[in-house]
Amino acid sequence: MAEAEEKRVGVGEARAPLAVEALRGKIVEKVKGNRVTLIVGDTGCGKSSMVPQFLLEENMEPILCTQPRRFAVVAIAQMIAESRNCQVGEEVGYHIGHSNVSNLNSKRSRIVFKTAGVVLEQMRDKGIAALNYKVIILDEIHERSVESDLVLACVKQFMMKKNDLRLILMSATADITRYKDYFRDLGRGERVEVIAIPSSPRSSIFQRKVLYLEQIVDILKMDSESLSTKYCSGPNTAADAGLKPDVYELIHRLLLHIHQNEPDIGKSILVFLPTYYALEQQWIRLLSASSMFKVHILHRSIDTDEALQTMKVSKSCRKVILATNIAESSVTIPGVAYVIDSCRSLQVYWDPIRKTDSAELVWVSKSQAEQRKGRTGRTCDGQIYRLVTGPFYNSLTDHEYPAILRLSLREQVLMICCAESRAMNDPHVLLQKVLDPPDSDVVEDALESLVQIRALDKPTSPRGRHEPTFYGCLLNSLPLSFDASVLALKFGDTGSICEGILISIMLDIQPLPIVQPFGHQQLCKMYRNNYFEEEGIDLQTGKKEAALVGNLCAFQFWQRMFKDKYRLDCLINVVNTHEPKASNGFVAKPEDEWCAFHNLVPTALNYISEIYDDIMGTLHRFRPSFLVKINPPMYLQPSEFHHMCLRHEVLELENVNSLPLEAENSHLDSHRRCAATPYVSPADFGTTTVVKTLKTLIKEMKTQSAADRVTYRELVHGYVQPALENEMCVFFLNGSCNRGDTCHFSHSSRAPRPICKFFLTLQGCRNGNSCSFSHDSGSLVSSSITSGICSQENRATSVCCKRLLPAAGDGHILVMNDKSLQFACKLCNYYDPTKIIACTPGPHSFESDSVTKGLKILQNLADPSYLFIGGEHKLSVPWTKLSRVFWFADIDSNESISEQVVLQKFFQHIAIKTLSEKMSDLQVIVIMNNAKFVQLQVERLARECFLFLGESFMFDEATLGWFSDTPNYPRGMQVSAPVAYIFSMHPPTGIQFGDYASELRKVLYSN
C-alpha cells in the first residue's frame, strides 16, 4: 500500500528536488573547514551539477571540476550554463583535448570542467601554477584511469605546499576507507571529512528495480536451463566475457517485451554493450523493428555534438540508446526508464608479447554495475536488467582493476620525467605515491624502454635521475598518444611532416573524416574506396593502414576542393571590400552540404585541422632539425588536380531497410551523392609514396619496440647479416609442400621462419607466441633501431644570407615593416641597393649618410593593402621583377593582436597580387621570433592564402640586424629566437576553379 501511495513523476514533468540540495549548507561548511572533503551519494543525487554551484554562490571560486570522459565534461558544463542563463565559455567553461571553451570575453570562467588528461598536462607544464583555483573537484573517483590516479597523486603533492587549496572527491561507489587513509598523511591535524548524501524522502524518490537472468527468462517465458552457461559461458567471472549470439537475441526480445508492455512511449531504453562491433550487431537485429524505435549510438567514435542529441526527450517514437561505458557515469539522459546491462566492458592492457596495447572483454565490477544502474530512476522510475544470474553477479569484483596496474606506463613515465616541478618529476617517487602503486619493475622497464629509443638519458650517478633528451621532450609535448607521436616525428625525418602529422592525428581521434554508416560495413568500405582503394596500388597494407590512408586522402581532397574554393572566394571578397576575412569563418551549411555530398564528416575535418596547427606550433617552439627544409604537402600534387561533381540519387545499398538512427546515419537524409568516383585516384596526392613510407616506419617502430628481445647473429656495416641458411618453406610449415628436395626453401625445423606479415602492421599479430611465423625482427635493418631520432636545429650553421637572397643578383627585393631600416640597410651590404625597396610602417627621420645610396624608401605603409591595391598608381614597385618579399616582424609584446591583423592583410594582398599577375616564383620571407610565430598562427594565416612554408632557419642577427623582441624565457628545451620563414606560392588548380587570375585582375584594377 505504501508503494502505491508514493508520488510518481512522469517523463516530461518537473523534476523532484535533488537529494544533494538538502545538504547545501553542510557541504559549504565542511569544504570551508576542511582541506579534503569526500562526498558520497547515490547516482542521480545531483553531486556533479549542484556542488560546484553551491560553492560558486558562496564566492569560493574559481572552481576546477574534473570528469573521466569528454562527453560528461561537455554535457555537464552545458547543463550548468543553461541553468545559470549564461553561454558556455563565460561563467561556466570546459576544456577537452584541443577544445578550450573557457575564459571567453577576456574574463576567467568561474567554473571550469576538464578531463583528467588536460589537468595532468597543465600540471606537467606549469606545476603548482596549474592549480590556481580555490576548490578542485575530482568527480567519479571510482573510475581508475591512469590519468585520474596521477592527478590525484599530483594534487596531493601540491597540497603540501598550497595550504589554501580545497579538494573535493565525489563518487557513488568509491571505497571510502581507502581514500580517507590515502590523505591521512596530508598534514598534522588534517582530516578527511566524509559527507554521505542520504536518499530523498520516499515521497519524492523514483524507484529502481533490479532483475537478473532468472527473472528475465521468466518474464520472457524462455527456457531457464543452464542460464550461466548459455549467456555467461560459465558460473562465475572466470568464464569468457565474450558475447554469444544468444545474448544479442535475449536483448532483442527484452527490448520488444519492454516496448509492448510500457504504454508511455516517452520512456527510453539504455543498453550497455562493450564494443562498437557489439553495438552494430545489436542494431542489425533491431532492423526488423524499425517502426518502433528511434536509435541513438553512444560511442567514442561519435561526434560529441551528435552524442548530445541523446539528451533530447523523444515523444513521437521510443528512444533506444545503444552505448558503451561512455554513458556509465555523471550524465543524466532524460527519460531513461529501462537499463539493459550486458555486464561486460572493454579493457585495455599492455601485451608484452606483441609490444602494444591490446583490448579484451572483461566482466564489469559491482561498482560499474551500480553506476549503470544509476542511469535510470533519475527522471522517472526505472528497471535494470542485468544479463547475469544472481550468484554470478555476487562473484564480480567490488571495484575495477586500476588501469595503472595494467599498462606499460611508458607515456606516463616520460611525462613525469619531463615535468617542470620537482614535486612530480621523479617517476619512481611519484608512482609510489599513487593509490595503487605499480610494481617497481614495471617502472624500470618503462625507463629502460625510453632510454633505448633515446627519449631519456641514463642517470650519470647511482642517485641521479633519468633526464629527458630533446627527442623525449618533443615526444612528450606533442598532443598525441605515445606511438602516434613517435610516428609523426619519424615522418618528419623523412621530409613528409605534413602527412605524418595528419596520419598520427587519425591514429588517435574519432570520428574520422570518412562517414561510417552505422551497421553497413559494405557501405563503409565503398565510401573509403572512393578515396583510397588498396587494389589500385601494388602494395599490400594492413586494415588499419588502409583506413588511415583513406582518411588522409579524404582530408586532402577536402583541402583541395572545398577549402581552396573558399580561400579564393575570401581573396576576391578582400579585393571588393578592402577588409580581411577570416578563412575559418565560413558558413557551416555549405560545408555540411558539400561534405554530405562526398560522404565526409565536417566536424572531424575541422578538428583535425585544429590539432594539426597545434602540433605544428609545438614543433616550431622546439625547432627540430627537419624544420629547416619542409616538403610541401603531397596533396598539392598534381598541381592540376581536377574533380567534377556528378549528382545522383543514393545507391540501392543505401536504401536498405534502416532504423531511424539519430547519430551516424543522419547523412543519408539528403539522398544525393557525388557519382564522380573515385574522388581520389592512386596517382593523386603522392598516395603510393605515403603508403610506402608508412609501411617502412611501422616496421621500424615494431623493430624498435621489440629490440630488447632480439639477438642479432652478426652486425655488418650498419645492417644485420641474416643467417646463411635459407628461410623455412611456408608450405612445409603448414605440412603441404610437395616439392621435397627440389624446394628452394628450407625444410629444416631450425631454419629461420618467414616474418609474420601481421606482426609488422599497426594492428599487430593477435596470435602472439603461438603464431607459426616469426616475430623476430633480427632480420630487419638494425639501423631502424636508432634512426628517426630527431635532433634540434644547430644554431651554429647559419648561412642566412645565401638562403635569403636571390641567386646571382637576379630580381628585386621588397622589405616591409622595417621600422628602423636596419634590416634593409644590412641587406645592402650583400645585395645591389638599387634593387631593394624598403617600406616603413610610419614616418621615418634619418640622416642621409646613414642610409645606403640607391636604397628606395617608402614611408607610412602601416596598412600593407595601400602598397598592393590602393596606392599602386602612386607607389612604383616593379612587381614583375620582384623575387623576394620580406616581412621584418620585430614586434613589441603589446602589439601582438594588431600585428596578427596586419600580417593577415599582408598575406592576403601578396596572394592577390601574386595570383593575379601569375608571379608563382615569388618567395615571401617572414623574419620573426619563433614563439611569436606560433602565438600569431602565422603559418595558418599564410596557408589560407596559398602560401606554404618550405624552409625555416635561425636568423643571423649579428649579420642582418638585432631584434628587440625578447619573449619570456622558453620552457625546457624550447627555443626563443628570431627565425627566417620562407614561404612559396602553390596556386589552386586552374582546371578546377577556372581563370581566377583574370577575375582577380578585373576586380583588382576596377577598384
Curated annotation (Swiss-Prot):
SMART domains in the cross-refs: AAA, DEXDc, HELICc, ZnF_C3H1
Its EC number(s): 3.6.4.-
Top-level EC class: hydrolase
Chain ranges of zinc fingers (C3H1-type): 723-750, 751-778
Gene3D superfamilies: P-loop containing nucleotide triphosphate hydrolases, Zinc finger, CCCH-type
Highest taxon of source: Eukaryota
Helicase C-terminal domain sequence ranges: 250-420
GO molecular function, one term: helicase activity
Amino acids binding ATP: 41-48
Entry-linked Pfam families: DEAD (PF00270), Helicase_C (PF00271), zf-CCCH_4 (PF18044)
Helicase ATP-binding domain mapped to chain residues: 28-192
Keyword terms of this UniProt record: ATP-binding, DNA-binding, Helicase, Hydrolase, Metal-binding, Nucleotide-binding, Repeat, Zinc, Zinc-finger
InterPro entries: AAA+_ATPase, DEAD/DEAH_box_helicase_dom, Helicase_ATP-bd, Helicase_C-like, P-loop_NTPase, Znf-CCCH_4, Znf_CCCH, Znf_CCCH_sf
Motif DEAH box in this chain: 139-142
PANTHER family named among the record's database cross-references: ATP-DEPENDENT RNA HELICASE, ATP-DEPENDENT RNA HELICASE DHX34-RELATED
Protein name stated in the entry: Zinc finger CCCH domain-containing protein 4
Species for this entry: Oryza sativa subsp. japonica (Rice)
